[in-house]
Amino acid sequence: MTSLKSLFLSFFLVVALGLALVNASEPRGPKITNKVYFDIQHGDESLGRIVLGLYGKTVPETAENFRALATGEKGFGYEGSNFHRVIKDFMIQGGDFTRGDGTGGKSIYGAKFKDENFKLRHTKTGLLSMANAGKDTNGSQFFITTAVTPWLDGKHVVFGEVLEGYDIVDKIQNVPKGRNDRPLKDVKIVKSGELEMEADVANEGDKKGSHNEL
């Protein structure tokens, strides 16, 4: 009987150790520190809300720039601006709230700011990354990936991801377009702001001039 108990005990210890090793080996993603939203309208049609999580631990300056532009707390920002460039199976681009054509925009730090780091890669759909016109030319323009885009690694700073509303991103990438990949009807951010963080959202990441060109 004693040997049988020892056998069962050994079995449970092996199982527990195996589970611990699996959990320890799971890849841990960047921590989400802030959550912002865009309410989107296409022409006269309301598409709904996109909720975005920001990686404020990994890229704090870039995440703070986007957060403040989403709230408009500096007196300028994303509300009322359009997604001016949309390419199916690649990305949707917005954030030019000064000119609206991909040649404008500005950051909360001035016209442009440096590439903070390239620790994060473009490994999945729904990632939020900075559009730019070359090295250290970040302003306010951004894009959301609709494909895995490894050729952008080391050139564009990834700083967040879509938490809710990727179906809306998918609708945007499929709208009719004209010249320069611009939607024929405006795809507008009619309202934007910051949402209260919840504990599960905060830990989600741990579980898992010239045109700005990509």
Swiss-Prot record:
Residue ranges occupied by any PPIase cyclophilin-type domain in the UniProt entry: 37-194
Annotated SUPFAM superfamilies: Cyclophilin-like
Record keywords: Endoplasmic reticulum, Glycoprotein, Isomerase, Rotamase, Signal
Glycosylation sites: 138
GO biological process: protein folding
InterPro entries: Cyclophilin-like_dom_sf (IPR029000), Cyclophilin-type_PPIase_CS (IPR020892), Cyclophilin-type_PPIase_dom (IPR002130)
Similarity remark: Belongs to the cyclophilin-type PPIase family. PPIase B subfamily.
Catalytic reactions on record: [protein]-peptidylproline (omega=180) = [protein]-peptidylproline (omega=0)
Name of the molecule in the record: Peptidyl-prolyl cis-trans isomerase B
Biological function: PPIases accelerate the folding of proteins. It catalyzes the cis-trans isomerization of proline imidic peptide bonds in oligopeptides.
